[in-house]
């Protein structure tokens, strides 16, 4: 194919990146009108023919995320309706990529299974089975058997009497109890509900838990939905960079090419960081360890890992402070103060093996003395694995949003003797007060790519503290190779 058959449209999320990608391809962005109607609906008009053309639509998932994504969907649909031969969505930062969920079928049924031997409860309502199977099952008594025992207990076998219709109040009560026993297995009793019987509170609670066993708390995660929306709009291909979750392409039924910022990051470390040979690559959490070790191995540098124990432990306390499933913590009479207690392990060789940082939420000193020693506390542990004393540390992460992770990691590294801390990030979203937090943190320099516009970052932190690395060369080369039917595997290791 010739490059004359290619058409590149750009959304309004990142016009600067669109221009740079087109400069690398030595073409001009195609003309498109982007706007909104008075009621806020997206309005798009294509100003160039796309019939039988290879169309690439560049739109990063930043800014007003929902508006930009809807704009992308309408652009894809418009190009497909205008007889484009192929439409590729180029999303340097794929929005909603941090919300992957379990894949589900097109009808909405989750593709999830549980080993049958792990089920320890009967289905409600129960599966119909023959009475012989119910009575012969070891360790189980059916409702019919209990009814049979109740009837036999009222019959005198030595002096048999004619069976009469029971009319006494006692017999009526017994029959009512039997009916209640039979109906209990089919009517769920919610603990604390209006139908709750105090005598059967334990059984009802067990029944309620059994019915909801295996039920996933319905926190909606839009991973599969985003993939289906792009496919339904008419996208034939997706190009993105440094996906937060590597399993995300599995949600698509169209090809997905996930590019990497690793070659550009390695090039920056080699040419822009003094004495990088003695630096340490640091992963701020266990999830990014594979990404960080890939750079460390390629540059033959040391590696360190910061492990966060997110599951808080409730220590022994009064009964009213016990946290159960679905419960809530009692309101503290005083604000909680976070105390950082660092412990440093040193060996005879002088190397620091594992440094632990304990974060304990306790009350202030004045309130602690007045409380009992067994008051409830939460303990959260952060461990640094690796030697960073007198070393330059480079924190490598794919995405920064609130910046809590990298700022806490930088503080821990400085506490453990690091001389300088760099933060090398692919996608800098920086929502809320993230930039203010970074400005007050121990991060000496922030290196970030331009998959998301960084004008506000440069304005707030200054050019002396921020370096923006350009990824348009990798994305442009990927578009050229895909358009010409060439392999893009070289871009994963060597870049453009």
From Swiss-Prot:
One GO MF term: ribose phosphate diphosphokinase activity
One biological process term in Gene Ontology: 5-phosphoribose 1-diphosphate biosynthetic process
Keywords assigned: ATP-binding, Cytoplasm, Kinase, Magnesium, Metal-binding, Nucleotide biosynthesis, Nucleotide-binding, Phosphoprotein, Transferase
Pathway: Metabolic intermediate biosynthesis; 5-phospho-alpha-D-ribose 1-diphosphate biosynthesis; 5-phospho-alpha-D-ribose 1-diphosphate from D-ribose 5-phosphate (route I): step 1/1
Keyword Metal-binding set for record: yes
Gene Ontology, cellular component aspect: cytoplasm; ribose phosphate diphosphokinase complex
Database matches in SMART domains: Pribosyltran_N
EC identifiers of the protein: 2.7.6.1
Positions of modified residues (Phosphotyrosine): 119
Enzyme class (EC, first level): transferase
Protein's name according to its UniProt entry: Ribose-phosphate pyrophosphokinase 5
Catalytic activity: D-ribose 5-phosphate + ATP = 5-phospho-alpha-D-ribose 1-diphosphate + AMP + H(+)
Additional detail: Present with 3310 molecules/cell in log phase SD medium.
């Amino acid at each position: 194919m010739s490059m004359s058959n290619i058409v590149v449209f750009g959304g309004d999320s990142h016009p600067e990146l669109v221009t740079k990608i087109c400069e690398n391809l030595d073409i001009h962005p195609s003309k498109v009108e982007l706007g909104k109607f008075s009621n806020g609906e997206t309005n798009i008009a294509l100003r160039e023919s796309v019939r039988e053309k290879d169309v690439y639509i560049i739109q990063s998932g930043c800014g007003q995320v929902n508006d930009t994504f809807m704009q992308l969907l309408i652009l894809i649909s418009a190009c497909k309706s205008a007889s484009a031969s192929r439409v590729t969505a180029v999303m340097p930062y794929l929005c909603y990529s941090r919300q992957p969920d379990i894949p589900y079928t097109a009808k909405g049924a989750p593709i999830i299974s549980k080993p049958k031997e792990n089920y320890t409860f009967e289905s409600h309502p129960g599966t119909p089975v023959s009475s012989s199977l119910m009575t012969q099952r070891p360790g189980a008594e059916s409702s019919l058997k209990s009814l049979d025992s109740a009837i036999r207990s009222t019959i005198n076998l030595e002096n048999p009497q004619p069976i009469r219709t029971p009319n006494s109040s006692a017999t009526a009560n017994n029959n009512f109890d039997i009916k209640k026993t039979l109906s209990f297995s089919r009517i769920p009793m919610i603990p604390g509900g209006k139908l709750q019987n105090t005598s059967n509170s334990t059984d009802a609670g067990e029944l309620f838990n059994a019915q909801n066993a295996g039920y996933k708390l319905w926190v909606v995660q839009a991973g599969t939905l985003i993939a289906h929306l792009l496919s339904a709009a008419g996208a034939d291909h997706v190009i993105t960079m440094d996906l937060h979750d590597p399993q995300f392409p599995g949600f698509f039924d169209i090809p997905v090419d996930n590019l990497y910022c690793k070659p550009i990051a390695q090039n920056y470390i080699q040419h822009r960081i003094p004495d990088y040979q003695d630096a340490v690559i640091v992963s701020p959490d266990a999830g990014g360890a594979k990404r960080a070790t890939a750079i460390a191995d390629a540059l033959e540098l040391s590696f360190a890992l910061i492990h966060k124990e997110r599951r808080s432990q409730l220590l022994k306390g009064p009964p009213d402070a016990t946290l159960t499933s679905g419960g809530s913590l009692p309101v503290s009479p005083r604000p909680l103060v976070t105390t950082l207690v660092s412990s440093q392990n040193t060996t005879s060789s002088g190397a620091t093996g594992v440094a632990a940082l304990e974060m304990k939420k306790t009350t202030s000193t004045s309130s602690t003395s007045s409380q009992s020693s067994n008051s409830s506390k939460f303990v959260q542990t952060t461990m640094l694995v690796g030697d960073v004393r007198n070393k330059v540390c480079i924190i490598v992460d794919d995405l920064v949003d609130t910046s809590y992770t990298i700022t806490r990691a930088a503080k821990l590294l400085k506490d453990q003797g690091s001389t300088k801390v760099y933060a090398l990030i692919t996608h800098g979203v920086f929502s809320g007060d993230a930039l203010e937090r970074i400005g007050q943190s121990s991060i000496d320099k922030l290196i970030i790519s331009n998959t998301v516009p960084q004008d506000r970052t440069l304005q707030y932190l200054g050019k002396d503290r921020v370096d923006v690395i350009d990824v348009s060369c990798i994305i442009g080369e990927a578009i050229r190779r895909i358009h010409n039917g060439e392999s893009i595997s070289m871009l994963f290791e060597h870049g453009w």
